[in-house]
Every structure is written in structure tokens, then in C-alpha cells.
């Protein structure tokens, strides 16, 4: 047993973490898509490298060899006119994600804007090339088909990028397809040119979804379970249900999840 975090009156161990994950219904064979903010938890009791390694190990112990772990490693490279170097382009979101992608056996997807790191029994399903960041065969598409679970590790406000998959599926009018081109360097140092479509926001109109409105939808649908752990929360969301509810809500009113919209627009009838 390894000590992970301490709070004012308690020490949280790897056993505590595994129990918390099991209490959330995580089990052998699960496909987990994890967004994390590990600095929301208590005071680390071991160095950052060991802390991150122990957290990843806990997840794999619960989901087993038959499970699959996925984390976003977004770089937005082509948006910034940069080369996407699969080995060396740092992720812009979260230290745990960056740690995970560098572990032995972890593969990274080819998307030069929204890449993901993946390891596990079903990793091949997630490594397909796609024409559009959030379109057919994208990681979000496969997560939905495979009944994966979204884990918010460190609080409910960690991320809501999955909503963009729903927005693209519904072809909301406040977004549009834009082509991005650039150069990819693969694991072996080979360079290729790549084009990819990204369903971007129209910046001149109200087009920004808020985490609050997405959360409200998930709570109303009873599709977010949370457990307290070391002064923060670990939450789990059923991705397929997220998709089904999100498409219903946007079919009724495509602006329902946007900033400054009518607060009553969010009923799921």
C-alpha cells in the first residue's frame, strides 16, 4: 500500500483510491476516458513521478488487462501552424496526461489538434485515422460505440470536450467546418502532410458551451456519479447516455447549452 495524499485529518492510499474507483462502478474490461486535475487533491505524500505512476497503476488494476485507458493529449498544433510531432509535442492539458503518454506501450493517435494517448486491450480501435477531429472514427465516436465511461478525476469542472462531438453530430449552426493542414512526424521520425477538418466555433456569435450547462444536463439525467477522495471529487459519466441525452437536448434547442442562453432551455422531456 502506498500513501498518495494527505488532508487535514486523513491519509489516502492506493487501496483507498482503488476502493473509490470500484464504488463508482468501474470494473474489469472497462474502457475509461480520463480527464484529470491531480493538483485538486490533497497534499501529495510522494514525488510527482511516483504519484502519477501509482494513480495509473490503480486504474489498470481495476480494469485489468482486458480494459483500456484513454487520456486526451491535445496539442492544437495545426491551429498554431506548428508541426505535430507524435513523440515530442507536449500535451496542453494536464500533467498526468503527459506522464501517461510517455509510458512504455502507450500509443498516441494521429490527430494534430486533438490527439489521445491510449493503452489496453481495445487500443487498436482508437488509432484509426479520421477526416474530422470529432467526426466518424474519431476517438469520441469510438468511445460512444464502445460504451466507454468518462472519468473526471479531480472535480466536476475538469473538462467537457466530448460535447463538441455531439455538436458536430447534430451539425449545430453556430459551428462550421474549417480545414487545417500541416506536417506530422510519426514515432519513427517519418514526415507526412495531413489535412483535417475541425468543426470550429463561429467567434462572431454566441457559440460557447459552458461546463455548467453540460453538468446541469448530466445531473438532470442522473448520469454523473461522484465520490469524494482526498479533498476533491472523482466522477463518472456513461458516455453513450451523454450522447443520447445531448442529441435530444440539442435537437429540441440547439442553443440550449450555450453561454447566456435562456436558463429554462434545458429540460430533457
Annotate each language-model stretch with its function.
Residues 1-269:
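N-terminal and secondary-structure boundary signal
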Amino acid at each position: 500500500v502506498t500513501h498518495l495524499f494527505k488532508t487535514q485529518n486523513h491519509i489516502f492510499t492506493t487501496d483507498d483510491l482503488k476502493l473509490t474507483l470500484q464504488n463508482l462502478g468501474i470494473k474489469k474490461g472497462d474502457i475509461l476516458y480520463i480527464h484529470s486535475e491531480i493538483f485538486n487533491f490533497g497534499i501529495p505524500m510522494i514525488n510527482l513521478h511516483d504519484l502519477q505512476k501509482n494513480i495509473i497503476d490503480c486504474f489498470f488494476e481495476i480494469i485489468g488487462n482486458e480494459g483500456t485507458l484513454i487520456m486526451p493529449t491535445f496539442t492544437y498544433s495545426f491551429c498554431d501552424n506548428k508541426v505535430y510531432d507524435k513523440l515530442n509535442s507536449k500535451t496542453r492539458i494536464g500533467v498526468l496526461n503527459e506522464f501517461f503518454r510517455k509510458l512504455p506501450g502507450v500509443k498516441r493517435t494521429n490527430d494534430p489538434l486533438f490527439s489521445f494517448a491510449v493503452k489496453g486491450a481495445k487500443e487498436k480501435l482508437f488509432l484509426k485515422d479520421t477526416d474530422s477531429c470529432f467526426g466518424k472514427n474519431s476517438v469520441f465516436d469510438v468511445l460512444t460505440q464502445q460504451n466507454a465511461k468518462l472519468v473526471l478525476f479531480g472535480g466536476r469542472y475538469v473538462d467537457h470536450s466530448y460535447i463538441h462531438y455531439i455538436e458536430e453530430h447534430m451539425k449545430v449552426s453556430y459551428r462550421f467546418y474549417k480545414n487545417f493542414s500541416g506536417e506530422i512526424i510519426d514515432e519513427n521520425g517519418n514526415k507526412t502532410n495531413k489535412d483535417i477538418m475541425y468543426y470550429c466555433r463561429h467567434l462572431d456569435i454566441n457559440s460557447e458551451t459552458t461546463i455548467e450547462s453540460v453538468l446541469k444536463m448530466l445531473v438532470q439525467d442522473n448520469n454523473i456519479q461522484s465520490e469524494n477522495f482526498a479533498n476533491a471529487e472523482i466522477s463518472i459519466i456513461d458516455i453513450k447516455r451523454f450522447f443520447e441525452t445531448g442529441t435530444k437536448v440539442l435537437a429540441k434547442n440547439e442553443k440550449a447549452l450555450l453561454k447566456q442562453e435562456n436558463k429554462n432551455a434545458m429540460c430533457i422531456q
